[in-house]
C-alpha cells in the first residue's frame, strides 16, 4: 500500500537565497530592545547597561558601507532588528580596503567615544558614581598592535577610563584637564636625536681661572709636557726618548763622550756580552767540536777546489758508498790509479798513517793531504797537490801503455789501503758527486750509533767535510798555542784547547784573541803543520 505525502509549496527557492544570507547569524534577543539616546526617563542600572551596549556596538566595529548595502538589499524579508545586526556583522566580516581608511575610521570612533562619555557623565546627575563605559568592551588594538600608540600615547592615556570618582571631584578637575590640553607637549619625533658627549680638551679642565688645573696622569692618553722642541733640546742620557747618535762628537760633552767609546748605551750594560767574561760558553757556541753544524760557507776554499780539478790529495771519500754502473766504472778506474800511486809512495808511510799508535809526531806524517776545511790554503800545499796530480797522470799513461799486472806480494801489502780506496774516488768533481748523489746524502755508518747516517747536505763540499770529520778513522786535532801558553815557546800552562777543524780554530783566533791579518795567518799555518791525529 502506497502513501502519498503532499508538501506545502516553498516560499523561496534556493536560487532566491543570496550568498550573503548564508553568513548571517540569527538575531540576538539582547539587541531587540533599543532606546533613543535623547530619552529623559530615569532607568535602572540594567537598563543603562543595555542602553550602552546597543549604542556602543557600531563604534567597536570596522566600517565598510558598500558591502553592508549589498548584504541588506539582497534580503527583502529582514526586519529592522535584523537589519542592524546584519549591518554590524558585515563590518566584522569585511576588511578595510586600505590602511588609511582604517586609521581614519579609528580616529573617528575614538572621537565619538570621548563625546559620548562626556554626555553620559552629565545626563545622570542623581547617580553617585558614573558607570564604567568600557567595562565589557574589548579594544581590537592593544598597546603593541595599535599603529597610533607611539605618536598619540599622551592622548590615549587621557582617554583611558579613570577610577570611579565623585562628581564633585570631577568638576574640580575639569578646568585643570582643559588647561593641560591647552599646553600639550609636541609629539615626539620618530627618530629623536641622540645626545653626544662633548670632547673635553686639556685646556678645558679646571673650569675657572681661580681654580688651579689638575691633571690626572692615570687618565691622560699622552704627556702634555712633551713637545718636539723638548725632545730636541733635552739630550739627557737617562731619558728613554733620546737615542744616542752614531757620532760621539755630536751633542755630547767631554764627560759623556767616553761612555760611547765602545757604542755602549748607559743603563744597558747588562745587555752586552763580553767575550772575556765567559770563555767556555762562547767557545761552545762558536766552535764546531761536535760536528753537528756543517753548513758554514767558505767561498775561498770552494773556488780553490773547483779550479784545481776536484779534491786531489784530500782523504775525502774513504767511506763513500755509491750505487750504479757509473760509480762501478769509476771505482774500477780508481783502483788502478790507487795501485800505481802505492808504487810511487813508500810502504813505510802507509804503515805510519794506518798502523800508528794513539799519538804520532808531526814529522812522521806526510803533509801531502791538507785539511779539507781550511779557510786559508798555503802555497806549499798547493804545489804539493799539483805535483801529486801530475804524478797520477804520468802513472796512468805508463800503466795504459805497459798493461802489466802487479805482483801478489804487492797486492797483499796494500790490501788494507786498496779496500778503503775502493769506496771513494780522489778525482771525483763536485758535478759528478751531484750526478750520482743528487741529495748529497751520507750513507756511511755512524760510529757512535752503529746505524746509517742518512744526513743530507746542500753542497758536495759539505758532504766531503762531514765524512772527513765524523766518519773519518783518524780524528784531526788543532791546538791553540795562545790558550795553552806556548805562543813564544815554553812548556805551556797545562791547559788544552783543541779543535777538530781548521775553520773553527781560525774563528777562535779572530774572535777570542782578536788577531787578524798576517798574525792570525801565521798561527793558523803553524797549527796545520803541527796537526795531530787520534784514532777514533
UniProtKB/Swiss-Prot annotation:
Record flagged with keyword DNA-binding: yes
Biased composition (Low complexity): 154-181, 361-370
Induction profile: Expression is induced by HAP43, by osmotic stress, by oxidative stress, by heavy metal stress, and during biofilm formation.
Location (main, coarse): nucleus
Biological process according to GO: proteasome-mediated ubiquitin-dependent protein catabolic process; regulation of transcription by RNA polymerase II
Sequence segments annotated as region (Disordered): 154-196, 353-375, 393-434
InterPro entries on file: Znf_C2H2_type
Cellular component per GO, a single term: nucleus
Gene3D superfamilies: Classic Zinc Finger
Biased composition (Basic and acidic residues): 393-411
Zn finger region (C2H2-type): 440-471
Subcellular location: Nucleus
The entry's keywords: Activator, DNA-binding, Metal-binding, Nucleus, Stress response, Transcription, Transcription regulation, Zinc, Zinc-finger
Single GO MF annotation: DNA-binding transcription factor activity
Entry keyword Glycoprotein: no
Function as written in the Swiss-Prot or TrEMBL entry: Transcriptional activator of a number of genes encoding proteasomal subunits. Binds to the DNA sequence 5'-GAAGGCAAAA-3', enriched in regions upstream of proteasome genes.
Protein name as it appears in the record: Transcriptional regulator RPN4
Species this chain originates from: Candida albicans (strain SC5314 / ATCC MYA-2876) (Yeast)
Organism phylogeny: Eukaryota, Fungi, Dikarya, Ascomycota, Saccharomycotina
Amino acid at each position: 500500500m502506497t502513501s502519498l505525502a503532499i508538501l506545502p509549496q516553498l516560499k523561496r527557492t534556493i536560487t532566491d537565497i543570496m550568498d550573503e544570507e548564508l553568513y548571517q547569524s540569527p538575531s540576538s534577543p539582547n539587541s531587540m530592545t533599543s532606546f533613543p539616546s535623547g530619552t529623559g526617563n530615569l532607568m535602572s542600572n540594567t537598563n543603562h547597561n543595555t542602553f550602552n551596549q546597543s549604542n556602543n556596538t557600531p563604534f567597536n566595529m570596522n566600517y565598510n558601507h558598500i558591502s553592508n548595502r549589498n548584504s541588506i538589499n539582497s534580503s527583502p524579508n529582514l526586519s529592522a532588528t535584523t537589519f542592524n545586526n546584519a549591518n554590524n556583522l558585515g563590518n566584522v566580516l569585511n576588511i578595510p580596503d586600505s590602511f588609511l581608511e582604517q586609521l581614519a575610521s579609528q580616529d573617528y570612533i575614538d572621537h565619538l567615544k570621548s563625546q559620548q562619555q562626556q554626555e553620559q557623565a552629565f545626563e545622570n546627575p542623581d547617580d553617585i558614581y558614573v558607570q564604567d563605559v568600557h567595562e565589557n568592551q574589548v579594544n581590537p588594538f592593544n598597546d603593541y598592535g595599535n599603529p597610533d600608540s607611539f605618536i598619540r600615547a599622551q592622548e590615549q592615556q587621557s582617554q583611558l577610563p579613570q577610577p570611579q570618582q565623585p562628581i564633585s571631584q570631577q568638576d574640580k578637575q575639569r578646568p585643570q584637564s582643559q588647561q593641560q590640553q591647552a599646553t600639550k607637549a609636541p609629539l615626539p619625533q620618530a627618530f629623536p636625536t641622540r645626545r653626544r658627549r662633548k670632547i673635553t680638551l686639556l685646556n678645558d679642565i679646571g673650569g675657572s681661572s681661580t681654580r688651579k688645573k689638575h691633571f690626572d696622569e692615570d687618565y691622560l692618553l699622552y704627556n702634555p709636557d712633551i713637545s718636539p722642541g723638548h725632545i730636541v733640546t733635552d739630550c739627557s742620557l737617562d731619558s728613554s726618548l733620546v737615542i744616542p747618535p752614531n757620532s760621539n762628537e755630536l751633542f755630547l760633552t767631554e764627560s759623556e763622550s767616553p761612555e760611547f767609546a765602545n757604542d755602549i748605551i748607559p743603563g744597558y750594560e747588562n745587555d752586552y756580552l763580553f767575550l772575556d767574561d765567559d770563555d767556555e760558553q762562547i767557545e761552545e757556541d762558536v766552535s764546531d767540536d761536535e760536528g753537528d753544524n756543517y753548513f758554514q760557507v767558505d767561498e775561498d776554499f770552494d773556488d780553490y777546489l773547483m779550479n784545481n780539478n776536484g779534491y786531489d790529495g784530500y782523504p775525502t771519500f774513504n767511506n763513500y758508498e755509491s750505487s750504479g754502473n757509473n760509480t762501478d766504472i769509476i771505482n774500477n778506474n780508481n783502483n788502478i790509479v790507487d795501485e800505481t800511486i802505492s808504487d810511487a809512495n813508500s810502504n813505510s808511510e802507509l804503515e805510519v798513517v794506518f798502523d800508528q799508535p794513539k799519538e804520532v809526531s808531526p814529522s812522521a806524517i806526510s803533509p801531502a793531504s791538507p785539511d779539507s776545511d781550511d779557510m786559508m790554503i798555503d802555497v806549499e800545499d798547493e804545489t804539493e797537490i799539483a805535483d801529486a796530480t801530475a804524478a797520477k797522470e804520468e802513472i796512468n799513461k805508463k800503466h795504459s801503455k805497459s798493461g802489466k799486472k802487479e805482483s801478489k806480494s804487492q797486492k797483499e801489502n796494500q790490501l788494507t789501503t786498496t779496500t778503503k780506496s775502493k769506496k771513494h774516488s780522489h778525482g771525483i768533481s763536485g758535478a759528478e758527486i751531484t750526478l750520482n748523489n743528487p741529495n748529497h746524502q751520507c750513507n756511511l755508518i755512524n760510529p757512535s750509533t752503529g746505524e746509517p747516517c742518512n744526513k743530507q747536505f746542500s753542497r758536495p763540499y759539505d758532504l766531503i767535510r762531514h765524512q772527513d770529520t765524523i766518519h773519518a778513522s783518524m780524528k784531526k786535532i788543532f791546538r791553540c798555542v795562545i790558550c795553552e801558553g806556548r805562543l813564544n815557546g815554553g812548556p805551556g800552562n797545562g791547559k788544552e784547547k783543541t779543535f777538530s777543524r781548521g775553520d773553527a780554530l781560525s774563528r777562535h783566533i779572530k774572535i777570542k784573541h782578536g788577531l787578524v791579518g798576517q798574525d792570525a795567518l801565521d798561527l793558523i799555518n803553524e797549527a796545520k803543520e803541527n796537526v795531530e791525529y787520534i784514532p777514533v
